[in-house]
Amino acid sequence: MNIRPLHDRVIVKRKEVESKSAGGIVLTGSAAGKSTRGEVLAIGHGRILENGEVKPLDVKVGDIVIFNDGYGVKAEKIDNEEVLIMSESDILAIVEA
């Protein structure tokens, strides 16, 4: 994938969610709902502050993150793969191993 987000934007690939129904049936994809976890594929250079300085992002490529899947998060299809473009402020947490 050849994409470079600008400023404080982050490209995230949503992780598939797997859950079980009350009867123990494993649900995947749309039946399980949309995951709010994903892997960071690319990051911008950082947020531009009022004084003109660039603040580097806290997330890095490869991080697994939990994000707010709402207004401001844009889904795009790039190289036949759906990715999400969001601001770093849409990321709520980094999952640490």
Swiss-Prot record:
Keywords: Chaperone, Cytoplasm
UniProt GO cellular component terms: cytoplasm
Pfam families named among the record's database cross-references: Cpn10
Primary residence: cytoplasm
Localisation: Cytoplasm
Highest taxon of source: Bacteria
Protein's UniProt keywords contain Chaperone: yes
UniProt key word Ribonucleoprotein: no
GO biological process, one term: chaperone cofactor-dependent protein refolding
InterPro entries given in the database record: Chaperonin_GroES (IPR020818), Chaperonin_GroES_sf (IPR037124), Chaprnonin_Cpn10_CS (IPR018369), GroES-like_sf (IPR011032)
A GO molecular function held by the record: protein folding chaperone
Its biological purpose: Together with the chaperonin GroEL, plays an essential role in assisting protein folding. The GroEL-GroES system forms a nano-cage that allows encapsulation of the non-native substrate proteins and provides a physical environment optimized to promote and accelerate protein folding. GroES binds to the apical surface of the GroEL ring, thereby capping the opening of the GroEL channel.
Family to which this protein belongs: Belongs to the GroES chaperonin family.
UniProt subunit comment: Heptamer of 7 subunits arranged in a ring. Interacts with the chaperonin GroEL.
NCBIfam families membership: PRK00364.1-1, PRK00364.1-2, PRK00364.2-2
Name of the featured protein: Co-chaperonin GroES
Origin species: Pectobacterium atrosepticum (strain SCRI 1043 / ATCC BAA-672)
Encoding gene, per UniProt annotation: groES
